[in-house]
């Protein structure tokens, strides 16, 4: 068998073949000279010298610069669009350095936003639409809000079925409860107004309870003193007087109150805070009831009338004094 055939067989197979007697190992193998034009287009990895040769880094650097200079004109003439890596030509290595990646003509942000939108949607589209409608209702039509609308979908927990207020972190089990809470506590919007006195409320149930004030019906009677009330909540507050329960103390003077709202109103005396301001004359009050009574001076509304002489009054205390002084009634 010719010697040249044995040498080619060793290059073609990776497994071990027994050498014939007389064969000699030659290291390093003879390097076949390559033409100059072909060597310039070759990859630096293919032109790297073998262990027995001298490692010339300057030559490798020049070959890399030559490859970059040849590829840059191709990139300049390429049309806009996604970059497609060309197939390696004969004599080039796929591991050779490629030109720097350029920005495509389309935006990755639009693609990412479309995918993120599909993952951030709430499980129920009806609940999400209900929350969006609730956010639009929170803005006051009279006083424009300077803050951005609250996005409650960011605090929705699909596994727990709860709704968190982004202002005070209070938790609700239904979106309707969250809507009522934000309308009452944070937005200042009171869409339900009384037809008799003009007082506004944040919920329809509160307005319905308020209408009993203008009627003469007193269906809630105290069993201890016999005093009757139009609302059950007023009776519950009255019962605290008989038990002398005052669980809410003032942090400034120590005075105790039956209700937390009464204690909060009392603290305005120490702080001088007057959060309720008249939109007509600008006068401020510490209690909302005083603002309502003051507003009747501008409108001329007199909700309390005497049943004997039909004279009207803006305050209930004025009607009581009139009955006592003019009609001798108590």
Curated annotation (Swiss-Prot):
Expression sites by tissue: Expressed in bone marrow and in spleen. Detected in hematopoietic stem cells, erythroblasts, and megakaryocytes. Expressed in thymocytes.
GN (gene name): Gfi1b
GO biological process, one term: positive regulation of granulocyte differentiation
Species, as recorded: Mus musculus (Mouse)
Classification lineage: Eukaryota, Metazoa, Chordata, Craniata, Vertebrata
InterPro entries reported in the protein's UniProt record: Snail/Krueppel_Znf, Znf_C2H2_sf, Znf_C2H2_type
Additional information: Transgenic mice with insertion of green fluorescence protein (GFP) cDNA in Gfi1b gene allowed to show up-regulation of Gfi1b in early stage of B-cell and in a subset of early thymic pre-T-cell. Mice overexpressing Gfi1b display peripheral T-lymphopenia and a profound defect in activation after CD3 cross-linking. Spleen cells show reduction in the numbers of CD4 and CD8 T-cells. Thymocyte lineage commitment and maturation are altered.
Observed effect of gene inactivation: Mice are not viable and embryos die by 15 dpc during the transition from primitive to definitive hematopoiesis. They exhibit delayed maturation of primitive erythrocytes and subsequently die with failure to produce enucleated erythrocytes. Their fetal liver contains erythroid and megakaryocytic precursor arrested in their development.
Pfam families per UniProt: zf-C2H2 (PF00096)
Keyword annotations: Activator, Developmental protein, DNA-binding, Metal-binding, Methylation, Nucleus, Repeat, Repressor, Transcription, Transcription regulation, Zinc, Zinc-finger
Descriptive protein name: Zinc finger protein Gfi-1b
Chain residue ranges for the region called SNAG domain: 1-20
Entry function: Essential proto-oncogenic transcriptional regulator necessary for development and differentiation of erythroid and megakaryocytic lineages. Component of a RCOR-GFI-KDM1A-HDAC complex that suppresses, via histone deacetylase (HDAC) recruitment, a number of genes implicated in multilineage blood cell development and controls hematopoietic differentiation. Transcriptional repressor or activator depending on both promoter and cell type context; represses promoter activity of SOCS1 and SOCS3 and thus, may regulate cytokine signaling pathways.
Region (Interaction with ARIH2): 91-330
